[in-house]
């Protein structure tokens, strides 16, 4: 997720973590870089979650193995920091070491409350950030170019993140549960999108709705903005900030045969509970699905 700020942010397993704590170092294979140019303009109702799911569908779950996915282009430039976090968060689902966006004015504006004592101005911070940009003559293992002007909301099927289809091809699929949250889509921007769709509506009687804000700070902000109230009035259960159902713990674990529409990042077999099926999607699609009880394009409500 931190790749959205221009950082090299790679996850490690427990063994590497223990070595890092004890020795102060971690061993990494030097990754190559795959540049992903995103052109065009996203349609209303299409989000960064749809973008990264589409990219994973094109690359496959092993397509970025031992590589950093460097996201660039007009679509990335127009994204908020939180949207970029979603983009980078799921780079690993294509096998990538991490995802990264070059820091720009959006980055400086977002970080300014935290770094204003270190720089004379945002312009000075931005100038400092530029040293971390890729060189004009940088070598890439691969350069991908996508025009996403016609991209539709994406939904996963089967048990791999690269199994994705436009929402229209999955519309009408029954779900037992809708889960909104996780490190992928539990930020305030995500909760606002879902709450806007849910406001004044109630979820289907056949659906359990579970929402888990990503952090205590986000929970408090959602509470202050009235978002938590909207979720509760619509029929959602609001949990404490947690990884929760994403990895089959806490509230929202699936029973065998149950189906969940989820804003999380992984749909592996048994991930959310033995015998359960997980369909990945954006918060907007998840909210619409909760209302109807079947996978639904939010733009049709």
Spell out what each predicted region is.
Residues 1-301:
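Fe-S-dependent hydro-lyases/dehydratases of central metabolism
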């Amino acid at each position: 997720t931190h790749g959205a700020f221009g950082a090299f942010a790679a996850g490690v397993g427990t063994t590497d973590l223990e070595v890092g704590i004890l020795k102060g170092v971690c061993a990494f294979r030097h990754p190559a870089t795959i540049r992903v140019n995103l052109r065009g303009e996203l349609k209303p109702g299409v989000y960064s979650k749809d973008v990264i799911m589409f990219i994973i569908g094109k690359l496959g779950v092993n397509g970025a193995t031992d590589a950093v996915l460097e996201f660039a282009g007009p679509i990335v430039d127009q994204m908020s920091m939180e949207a970029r976090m979603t983009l980078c968060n799921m780079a690993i689902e294509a096998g990538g070491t991490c995802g990264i966006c070059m820091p720009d004015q959006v980055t400086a504006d977002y970080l300014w409350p935290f770094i204003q004592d270190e720089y004379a101005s945002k312009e000075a911070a931005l100038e400092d950030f530029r040293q971390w940009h890729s060189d004009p003559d940088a070598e890439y293992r691969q350069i991908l170019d996508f025009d996403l002007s016609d991209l539709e909301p994406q939904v996963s099927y089967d048990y791999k993140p690269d199994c994705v289809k436009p929402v229209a091809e999955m519309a009408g699929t029954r779900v037992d549960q809708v889960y909104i949250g996780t490190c992928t889509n539990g930020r305030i921007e995500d909760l606002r999108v879902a709450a806007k769709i849910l406001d004044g509506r109630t979820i289907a009687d056949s659906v359990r709705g579970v929402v888990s804000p990503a952090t205590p700070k986000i929970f408090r902000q959602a509470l202050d903005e009235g978002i938590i109230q909207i979720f509760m009035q619509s029929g959602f259960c609001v949990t404490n900030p947690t990884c929760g159902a994403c990895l089959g713990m806490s509230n929202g674990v699936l029973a065998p045969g149950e189906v969940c529409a989820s804003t999380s990042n992984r749909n592996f077999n048994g991930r959310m509970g033995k015998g359960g099926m997980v369909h990945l999607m954006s918060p907007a699609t998840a909210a619409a699905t909760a209302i109807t009880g079947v996978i639904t394009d939010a733009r049709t409500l």
